[in-house]
Amino acid sequence: MARAIILMADSLGIGAAPDADKFGDIGANTLAHLLKAYYDETGTALSLPNLSKLGLIDACEAAGKEPCLVSNRSASQGAWGYAKELSSGKDTPSGHWEMAGVPVLFDWGYFPKTQPSFPQEFIDELIARTGIPGILGNCHASGTTILEQLGEEHVKTGKPICYTSADSVFQIAAHEESFGLEKLYQVCETARSLLDEMNIGRVIARPFLGSNNQDFARTSNRRDYSVLPPAPTLLDVLAKDGGEVISIGKISDIYAHQGITQKHKAPGLINLLKKTNELMQSAPDHSLIFTNLVDFDEMFGHRRNPVGYAKALKEFDDYLPTILNALKADDLLIITADHGCDPTFPGSEHTREYVPVIAYQPGMTDIPLGERNSFADIGQTLAQWFNLPALEYGDGFIDKLTTSK
């Protein structure tokens, strides 16, 4: 029986989506622009031989209609295409859920006011239920900038830092030692229950350490509290069929722990990839290994650091042969993304972009998949791969994969 491995390169968009104008994202192209920024700073094109060989650069140039500056480019030996998003938003849950067959066709709740951002009744109830002395922030903010601005006051007062963004999200930052990690999680759980009626997609715990605003840094103990997907996803269907659904990184949180049979955490890009390789050695047949590579988005996309993003992508490319060499004959590798986050774009938010659809099996030859009308095409393909009932959304391309070897 078959296995599948998904490497979700969080935020690796490859060109503005057809509806990018509705999001203020005309001209966005995460991959092409970080490659250009790297070239402009270093004078050399980034070498991504393994991702190039799988078709990532072909997909980016087809989707974004602009050149991708890479060296050591070789002909594709994988199936490659690009998908537009059917969901109404450009957020993390929408992208992940749609990829698993459940697009978000409703509108999330948001906090549109930049400051103060949150309803006073909600703040009052959160304080009453948790016993916190108040909150700091109450605004739209960059998660790193707000630590510099309010971290010391938080440590002195015990008031957690609460902030949001253009996404449907409520984020709480607190010091792991002075405030306490478990206390932070408890406050987040209370906030989650209060925000359900507002249809806020995620509450995120953002713990940090450090002694002053010069060295405050987030830790790896982030936790996401998502609402439940509105319908069963591919993960639920596979788990119900007796399969293993192995979450690595924040995947389990994003799917609100639905359809997950194993949960594994690892700090940082390379450790996430190493954990993936480790579990590929032991995962039984009829398993899905699903890894979110969050650093691309969190460390470089939102922080608008294109050269750092490029260097991280190079680390991914360098490790990729280890993953490829671990593939068995009946394994299918998928590399994709959940949205864009162009590090050269104004602001600090996600960007509405096409995402890569890369599929690879040992022995595969070049096969263009073209433009896909939904991220759900990936989920439908995996349903076919695992011989599961068809999902409601998505146009599978398994026939192209099985005839291309």
Curated annotation (Swiss-Prot):
UniProt cofactor(s): Mn(2+)
Superkingdom: Bacteria
Associated pathway: Carbohydrate degradation; 2-deoxy-D-ribose 1-phosphate degradation; D-glyceraldehyde 3-phosphate and acetaldehyde from 2-deoxy-alpha-D-ribose 1-phosphate: step 1/2
Cofactor note: Binds 2 manganese ions.
The keyword DNA repair belongs to this UniProt entry's keyword annotation: no
Disulphide connectivity of cysteines: none
Reactions accelerated catalytically: 2-deoxy-alpha-D-ribose 1-phosphate = 2-deoxy-D-ribose 5-phosphate; alpha-D-ribose 1-phosphate = D-ribose 5-phosphate
Gene Ontology biological process terms, A to Z: 2-deoxyribose 1-phosphate catabolic process; 5-phosphoribose 1-diphosphate biosynthetic process; metabolic compound salvage; nucleotide metabolic process
Cited function: Isomerase that catalyzes the conversion of deoxy-ribose 1-phosphate (dRib-1-P) and ribose 1-phosphate (Rib-1-P) to deoxy-ribose 5-phosphate (dRib-5-P) and ribose 5-phosphate (Rib-5-P), respectively.
Pfam families, alphabetized: Metalloenzyme
Alphabetized NCBIfam families for the sequence: deoB, PRK05362.1
Residue positions binding Mn(2+) 1: D10, D338, H339
UniProt binding sites for Mn(2+) 2: D297, H302, H350
GO MF annotation list: magnesium ion binding; manganese ion binding; phosphopentomutase activity
Record keywords, A-Z: Cytoplasm, Isomerase, Manganese, Metal-binding
Protein known as: Phosphopentomutase
Enzyme Commission number(s): 5.4.2.7
Alphabetical list of HAMAP family matching this protein: Phosphopentomut
Keyword Metal-binding tagged: yes
Family matches, as CDD domains: PPM
Family: Belongs to the phosphopentomutase family.
Gene Ontology CC annotation, any one: cytosol
Intracellular or extracellular location(s): Cytoplasm
Xref: InterPro entries: Alkaline_phosphatase_core_sf (IPR017850), DeoB (IPR010045), Metalloenzyme (IPR006124), Phosphopentomutase_DeoB_cap_sf (IPR024052)
